[in-house]
Structure formats: C-alpha cells, structure tokens
Amino acid sequence: MASLIYRQLLANSYAVDLSDEIDIIGSEKTQNVTINPGPFAQTGYAPVNWGPGETNDSTTIEPILDGPYPPTTFNPPTGYWMLLSPLEAGVVVEGTNNSDRWLATILIEPNVAAETRTYTLFGVQEQISISNTSSTKWKFVDLVKTSLTGTYSQYGPLLSDTKLYGAMKYSGRIYTYEGETPNAATGYYSTTNYDSVNMTAFCDFYIIPRSQESTCTNYINNGLPPIQNTRNVVPVSLASRAIISHRAQANEDIIVSQTSLWKEMQYNRDITIRFKFANAIVKSGGLGYKWSEISFKPANYQYTYVRDGEEVTAHTTCSVNGINDFSYNGGSLPTDFGISRYEVIKENSYVYVDYWDDSQAFRNMVYVRSLAADLNSVMCTGGSYNFALPVGQWPVMTGGAVSLHSAGVTLSTQFTDFVSLNSLRFRFRLSVEEPPFSIVRTRISGLYGLPAADPNNGNEYYEIAGRFSLISLVPSNDDYQTPIMNSVTVRQDLERQLGELREEFNALSQEIAMSQLVDLALLPLDMFSMFSGIKSTIDAAKSMATNVMKKFKKSSLASSVSTLTDSLSDAASSMTRNSSIRSVGSSISAWTDVSSQLTDASASTSTIATQTATISRRLRLKEIATQTEGMNFDDISAAVLKTKIDRSVQISPSTLPDIVTEASEKFIPNRAYRVINNDEVFEAGMDGRFFAYRVETFEEIPFDVQRFADLVTDSPVISAIIDFKTLKNLNDNYGITRDQAFNLLRSDPRVLREFINQDNPIIRNRIEQLILQCRL
C-alpha cells in the first residue's frame, strides 16, 4: 500500500540521530561577548525590542476623573456623575426643574443629637430637623419637596467616612448614593424635564462619565486616589485634548541625534499607494458544472509617480485577512451548478498593503520608532464573472463593494522574485457599501461584501494618497547599510518558495485521475520510489531522504506514535505489577484515553461527541499499527502526494522535507474510522460526528461509547473511505447487495475501482472530495 512511505519514515527516523548529535556538538559552543550599548540605549543594557513605535488612531479617550471644579451653577450633561467633595457641614448641592421637584442635599457632622437647624435652600431660610448618631461618619441627607410652597421631606441618608457624594441626571431620573460606606449604592428620584435641571454645587466637584460608574462607586466608598493640587483650577473643553500639532514639512529628512557611528533620522514622506487584488478561480473536475474555489491571492504591483518633482519607483503587495467563506450548491446532480467555496471580504476582514519605494527612508529600515501614518479612504467595487457552463445559460457573479479605512501601520518584509524588501505594512479595516453582490440565475442575491470573483472591476489598480513619518536608527555614513542576518533572509526566502509550492500543489488537485489514483494507492511506495521524480544525483537523493526523515521525526504524527508507545509500555508494566487490572482496560487507556471517563459514567461531564472525537484522534495510529487489506486514508494521501511531486515544477530538495511532513499532517483532515461487529458498524469522525447502524438495512441504532471503545481495542480499525452518508445515499439511489456493502465498509480497493470504472457519480464525488482535502 502507498502508506508504506509513512510507516518507513516512522520506523527509520532514528537514523538521523547521529547527524543531529554532530550538529549539536558543532553548535553548542560558548563565547564571551562584550556589548557597548552606546548613547541610544534606554538603560545600561543593550537595546531591546525595537518596534514600530507610536501609532496614531482616531480614538478619543475620555478621562475617568475630570476636575476638580470650583462651586458653580450649571446644567450638567445627562449621563455624567457629579462627584461632590465638601469640606464642612451645610448645604452640598441643590437642583430643581421649577415645576414638581426641588431636591437639595445637606451634610451633617458626626455626634449630632436631634435638633433643628436653619438652612438656606433655593434662596429661602428653612427650618430642618436633623440628627447624626454616628460617632465617626458624616451623614448626607436628601431634602425633597414637590411644590414651591411645600415642606421638605428627608430621603436616602448616606453615612460616609470619605465625605464624598454623587448626583447624576439620566433616563428621566436623578440618581444619588445612599446607605453606608463602604457598601453605599445608588438610588434615584423620578422627575419631569430632567434634562433641563440646573445644579448648584456649594463645594468642589469632579465629573465622571456613567461608563465609569463602578469607579465612581469605589471613590464614594473608599475615597479619592492621591491627586496633585494646583493653585488655579480652570475648566477646559475636552475637545482641545484631541488637537494634534504638525510642525514637520511634507517631505523632509531631519537628523534627530548623531554620534560618530550612528544617527537617528526622521523621515517625513507624502506617498501614493497603488494596489490591486489577485484571485484564483479553480474549476472542479467532471462535467464542467462545478467550481471548487474562488479565492483571494497576494498581488504585487510596481509603478512610478512624482513626489516633490522627483520620480519615485514604488512596489506594493496587497493581501487580505479575515475572509468569509461562502458556498452555493444548486443540487446533487452532476449537471447542477455549484461552487464549493468562494471568498468574500466584509466588515470583519482586513486588507494589508505592503509599500516600498526607492527613497532614502527605506534604505535602512531596520531599527525604527515613532512610526505614524495618515491615509485617505478608498472604495473598491466588484465586477462581473461569467461561469461558462457547457450547456444552458451562464450564472454571473456580479456586484459587491467595500470601502477601506486606515487602521494602522507596522514594519514588514516584501518578497519579490529577486530580492526581499523592508517595507511598511498599512492595515485597512473594511466597511460594506452599496451595491450588494449576487449570482444571477441563482437564488443568491442581496449579500454584502466584495467577492473574489472580480475584485478589481476592470481597474488596473486602486489608489490611496497619504503621508507617513518615522524615526530610523541608521549609520552616520550614508554609504553604509544596516546589516541584516543572512539566516533570517534565507529562511524567509524558503518560506516564499514553500508558499508558491503549496499553491501549485493545491492547484494540481483537479488534474488527478481517480482510476490512476486508486492503482497508485495500492502500490508499496518506499522513500526512493516516492522521490524518484526529482532530478538529482544519488548522493543528493541520500541526503534528501535523510533530511525528510529528520523533518518527519518532529511531525505531530511521529510525536503521537512516540507518546502512544510510552502509554502502551506504561499500560503493560501496570498490568504486570497488578493482576487485577484488565488488559482490555489498559489498552483502552492507551488507545482511546477515555477509560477513566467510562469507569464512572455519573462523574463524566464529557458528551458522546467529545468522547468519540477523543477516540478518533488515536484511531489513525491504531490503523497504522494494525494494517488491514483495505485501502486507508494514508494510501490516498501518499498517492496524491506522489502524483503531485511528479507533476510539480517547483519541488526541490530544500522544500521536499517540509512538503512531505505537511502532507502527513494536513492531507484529508476530515477523517472517519469504523469498526465492524457482525452486522453492526460503529463509525466515528475526528470532528465528533458518530453513527451506529446495521449493514442489512443501513438503519441507525443507539451509539454505545463503552462498546465502541472495547471494539477499538479488540477489532481492526478501518478507514471510512466511503462514509455512512455516502453508503446510505448509494443504497437509496442505486441499491447495493450485502456483499457490496461489506466490501465498501472494508474499503476493498477492487470494489472501489469497479464503482469508479462504472462512473458511479456518488462514489466518484466522494473520492473527489477526499482528493480536494489533500491541500497544504
């Protein structure tokens, strides 16, 4: 079977231990390094964590505690607390709507027996009976009357040792504090025309927004934090804090500081950013009515423009993040139009534009601080794409629009065909605009966002104007260039090659013939037959095989096998020490990792889906350890890998180890496994879905997790190449015999080839879906 390649890599990965030890011996050296931090260091140590520095944004930050303000009469805005801080007993604050509510608050010192005092309330002398029996706490009392000539009633006393009180107008009410510190809480009085109530404060006060009410309550109960006193307190409009003063010219280079070897340069630049989107439209195999993918791809664009009379050559790379996956299924027939996945960018997405030009600002862009940018917005509208069907009217994806708004700037690196460029990455947030997009002649309409079908709408590029400023640490001699670690550049170049190779591999999926794939999956592929398509010498082939094994040794599959081996060893040793432990239980613990959950069902909080998913993650390892005669997912994975390696024009010895390792981990992520017990089948997927059914009728039966775990230990595990839903669909539409059902359940390659040669659309579609899952 083709999966022999994975078994061989797992079995022989120890062969690279010697070369690893040699590399470790050569690299584990110590040497003394003396660092002279120079005048640009923040401390006595070397400079650390150079980054993009400050980044402007449009957020206005409202202060939590605004003040103090002197006694005054004014109409406070609704939704803001007045935090009053009186120094002595007497009237604290008063307010009225001049119709049906007069509210005043007085403060009484501790240890006051019942007596009558005279207070001036709203300009009138009033006799009020008061008392405060507390020996340590001051007492705030609300005095309320409902008519101009009425008498005052006392409400909402607050006993406080902080001498702080609060009042707020909000939602048709006047809110105050009541109770006793440190457990005081808010209360309220209903009133009409509350928004026109003028408040007169007889002491210093602060303003706190309602969004920070918890902080205000904390102040009431525990007191204010330490505040520096000033001699002159002048209220200032909050809007003045948002004013930013720009004193720099549009385009200039300023020396901020300089020593003999290094200098800090501030670069201010006007820029014109031009970018475009790229996309990939992949058609599925078959009769020509299905599309597998319509996706965004990174797009490079090079152009020139004039800045201050100087011609500038610029390079941009546009990419997207946070895409939304949509699909359309017109029906189950092979001639029904369908799109497996098409990407749309919306308000939860981001667009990244990496910008570089040939000016001095980008020559030494390695150590940068105080990076800021200010850019305009731009509208991007979608065009039309015709889905060319063999017969019938063509569906058309048309419309869609988003606007891009600047959301920040950071440093980045662009990769061209010849060189890597240190550049600026401008991040744009999106908002959806009119018109929505639709697929004409389908039920898809009125959706918002920009689909990947034709994002440029015939435009050569989109354009944004703006400016940026940064301070860069550069050599004092302009002829020198800041050194960059070569190893980083090499690794980044390898990542670029791997990215291109992954794209090529994914695009080759639709070109694989299924009948040839099944034949190839049955061949016993070893390492050298797998890599025979790569042009290289024998010595290079040996080195390449070693590199593949070295990389594969660190894969998640190899790590899982190692962990499983340790678990089985522990289970065996435990069984030897204690004869009362069942061997089946020990095996379950090693293979499924859920025996403890099954021991005490009442204490288990896991759902059946969680338990079956836990077991399913180990079933691939059980299948590798106990190979059956049927075809498995790794056979298909290895066959697809071999086919793509032979057809690839970009594969090389440097990229092969990463590709083989990724294929073992990422090909066919949605796997399902089954065990057969007489006429009953238990099937569980790695996504938590599970089925139990009878072979005779394909009728579902209750799923017993305990029994499934026991069968996993004692019975062979089989890859569900043809899963339960496909089998049931096949039986309902075509009818299959009992023998055919058992052969499909066992993934018999002979029966699979029969159905494929008969051009059975259900089986072909299932195999097509497995091939399309072989993506990197």
Swiss-Prot record:
InterPro entries: ConA-like_dom_sf (IPR013320), Rota_A_VP4 (IPR042546), Rota_VP4_MID (IPR035330), Rota_VP4_MID_sf (IPR038017), VP4_concanavalin-like (IPR000416), VP4_helical (IPR035329). Residues 389-409 are annotated as: Hydrophobic. Residues 484-511 form a coiled coil. Residues 510-776 are annotated as: Spike foot. Disulfide bonds join C203-C216, C318-C380. In group A rotaviruses, VP4 defines the P serotype. Some rotavirus strains are neuraminidase-sensitive and require sialic acid to attach to the cell surface. Some rotavirus strains are integrin-dependent. Some rotavirus strains depend on ganglioside for their entry into the host cell. Hsp70 also seems to be involved in the entry of some strains. Belongs to the rotavirus VP4 family. This is Outer capsid protein VP4. It comes from Rotavirus A (isolate RVA/Monkey/United States/TUCH/2003/G3P[24]).
